[in-house]
Amino acid sequence: GSEMCIRDRYYRNPAENDRAWRYGFYHTGDTAYMDEDGYYWYVGRTDDLIKASGYRIGPFEIESILMEHPSVLECAITAADDPIRGKVVKATIVLTKNYKPSDELAKELQNYVKRSTAPYKYPRIVEFVDELPKTISGKIKRGEIRKNDSEKN
């Protein structure tokens, strides 16, 4: 890996300085917690966190679980609008070549997540796609998925 260095301000960008720097601290936008043994656990980006049914849900944990299923080549977890709950967890999934999209597979994946973590974290919506939107460096563009979802509604 590479060392990350932070300068004392953004060059010619006062709005970004005001957003990121508060009381002498740089706010990265990453969220983590410390467990009872003193270990830190990465939850995810603040802008990617999902607030659903009163819980804060990080996409990384659910994505990691789904990636263990043999049908999942890659996936992205985002929030989707829900008329009753406000927001729900949505999984956008690219399948491996031996699997085809189906309601049965979606249900299997939902149950797979339920068995591996707290039941409230399971994706209530599963969408199968051919590919996920990515940056040039290969990072998934969750913001683009959310934007596409809001344009559909």
Q: What are these model-predicted stretches?
A:
Residues 3, 8-9, 16-19, 31-120, ...:
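AMP-binding/adenylate-forming catalytic core of the ANL superfamily
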Residues 7, 22-24, 153:
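Conserved ATP-binding loop and adjacent catalytic segment of the adenylate-forming AMP-binding
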Residues 147-153:
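Acidic/polar alpha-helix N-cap and adjacent early helical turns
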Residues 126-129:
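General small-molecule cofactor/ligand-binding pocket signal
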